[in-house]
Amino acid sequence: MKCPFCAHPDTRVADSRLMEERNAVRRRRHCPNCGKRFGTLETAELKMPAVIGPDKKRSPFNAQRLRNDLTAAARKSALTPEQIDETVRLTEHRLYTSGQRDIPSAALADMVLKELLRQDTEAAVRFAALHKRFDNPADFASWLAQAVKTGGKA
């Protein structure tokens, strides 16, 4: 790395420390040319995949929209605001670490539904009614029966 003081092209790493809370590495560097020390912070550049809607349009993932949809689905259910926030955080984390460039909206809905079914079946049913494409009421009933039967592993 180039020294910020003298622009010497080669600096030495004196010390490296992992910063768990930020998923980063802090490095202390030393310039052999001018003798000055400086620090760097290295983080991985993770990109959020774009969401591909049913109309094949790409749009950025919107955590607030997911939070609003979960809040609407959780009305009159036992799902707490903290559980909603945790579901949003978990979904964001899974998307970041998936390594995918794009994710279909149906796959995103399934990802959220798996977590919701584990927490609150009533909220999951409301969310599914809004976000899964059912051709007819029988398909919805079939999905619901499978979700209840597998205990949230639908």
From Swiss-Prot:
InterPro entries: ATP-cone_dom, NrdR-like_N, RNR_NrdR-like. Keywords: ATP-binding, DNA-binding, Metal-binding, Nucleotide-binding, Repressor, Transcription, Transcription regulation, Zinc, Zinc-finger. Binds 1 zinc ion. Residues 49-139 form the ATP-cone domain. GO terms for biological process: negative regulation of DNA-templated transcription. The keyword Repressor applies. The keyword DNA-binding applies. A zinc finger (unnamed) spans 3-34. GO terms for molecular function: ATP binding; double-stranded DNA binding; zinc ion binding. Its cofactor is Zn(2+). Negatively regulates transcription of bacterial ribonucleotide reductase nrd genes and operons by binding to NrdR-boxes. PANTHER family: TRANSCRIPTIONAL REPRESSOR NRDR. Belongs to the NrdR family. NCBIfam families: transcriptional regulator NrdR. This is Transcriptional repressor NrdR. The gene is nrdR.
